[in-house]
């Protein structure tokens, strides 16, 4: 009996101290994404950015800059800085796909985002993405956390 109790305590300790290492297992590193092609661009692990754009987001439900202009085939490194106290997202898409996805998020607010064109950025944190844009012009992006899109974060 004594040996059973002696084994329970170390087991509980191991579980408690290993939990933090699993707490962010749903987040992929950039190199872990599979190649993908969409109507607004593509991702593959070996992309090299020709320029870097820092996108700041805040609790006033705004992005800065509000617009990103790109050339056809341009590869950008996007650095997302959450300057707020709330969780924010940066999701690339078309105006239609973003509006549709925002509606879906209202029904499924805990839906995971695990695509290379999506960044879930905790308060005070930075995240990066690299993306190859398919066409020149302005590209749509938004925060799809329920309420943020409707408050103007698009």
Segments predicted by a language model, with ranges:
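Bacterial N-terminal signal peptides that target proteins for export
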Residues: 1-9
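N-terminal signal peptide c-region/cleavage motif recognized by signal peptidases
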Residues: 18-20
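Extracellular/periplasmic metallocenter environments
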Residues: 24-36, 62, 115-154
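Beta-strand signatures of extracellular beta-sandwich domains
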Residues: 54, 89-93
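Short aromatic-acidic-glycine turn motif
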Residues: 96-107
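Short beta-strand and strand-turn-strand segments in soluble, beta-rich domains
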Residues: 106-114
């Amino acid at each position: 009996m004594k040996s059973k109790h002696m084994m329970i305590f170390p087991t509980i300790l191991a579980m408690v101290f290993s939990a933090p290492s699993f707490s962010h297992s749903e987040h992929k590193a950039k190199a872990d994404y599979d190649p993908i092609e969409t109507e607004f661009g593509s991702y593959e692990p070996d992309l090299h950015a020709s320029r870097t754009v820092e996108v700041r987001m805040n609790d006033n439900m705004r992005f800065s800059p509000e617009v990103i202009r790109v050339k056809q085939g341009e590869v950008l490194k996007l650095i997302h800085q959450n300057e707020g106290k709330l969780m924010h997202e940066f999701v690339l898409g078309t105006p239609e796909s973003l509006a549709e996805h925002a509606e879906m998020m209202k029904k499924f607010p805990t839906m995971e985002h695990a695509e290379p064109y999506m960044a879930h950025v905790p308060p005070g944190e930075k995240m990066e993405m690299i993306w190859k844009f398919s066409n020149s012009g302005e590209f749509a992006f938004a925060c799809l956390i329920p309420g943020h899109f409707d408050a103007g974060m698009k």
